[in-house]
Amino acid sequence: MSDPTRTPIGATLSVDPEWGRTARAWGIFAGIAFAIATAAFVVEATGLLASSPAYTPTAAGQLIDEAKFFAASFGYQQQVLWDYVLRDGLYFFAYLALIPLAIGLREVAGHRRVAPQLAAAFLVVAANFGCMNAFMTFVQVDYWKNSGWDQVPAAIMVAVGRDVDLMNGLTRWAGIASFAALAIALYYLGRACRSGGVLPGWLGVVAYVGAAILLAMIVVSQVSGTDAINNLLSLAIGMVVAPIVTIGLGVHIARAASGAPEPVDGR
């Protein structure tokens, strides 16, 4: 049986054994964080915490109607503020955790191999957009945490509401960008697993399933009236696929690092 720590030309790879503890810790953390954050997202999205307001045109006119809608929306966001802080705080650090996993993957499996290196690269891209998505949510929290919006003049309320709507759109598209990058990363991770070496074949199957789910989520997000489908896909990717991939990746990077030769002379 071939040694998975050797390159195609037979040179032994030097891997810092510290990657064993590091990759395992970040993988487990990411898996748990993604699962809890996803649960918090679905609980809020399905209206279990409170009912989100809907825009209703009246004889008062568009300005007044929009002002009342934005004031009610801010009141709702304040009511479920703890959920946003919990889930987006966890999402932020869960996406950050993908970076050490990506570097660890490249260390133990990426030398001279296209698939692991591209998987690592797109994991980092996904991490950046995912962190941006969570960060911009906290910008909106600065508005939602304040009360008394129903006392604000209509013109000012509409201006503030539209500004927050713009930020919400940027947040949503940052999330879609992270899904796209993560889908590509999972595709290449699946290819890396199929080619043998330090990564098991079953992890590749899960990675392919995750890539398909993420692509489906991107499509569904552009179709109105598909919230229930999106929630189901979110549960599948966040509470099943993400924990399996991140924890599995961390564990197998750790195993590969513990079985590889230590670096010599700082290399």
Protein language model regions, located:
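Hydrophobic, aromatic-enriched alpha-helical segments typical of multi-pass transmembrane helices
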Residues: 2-267
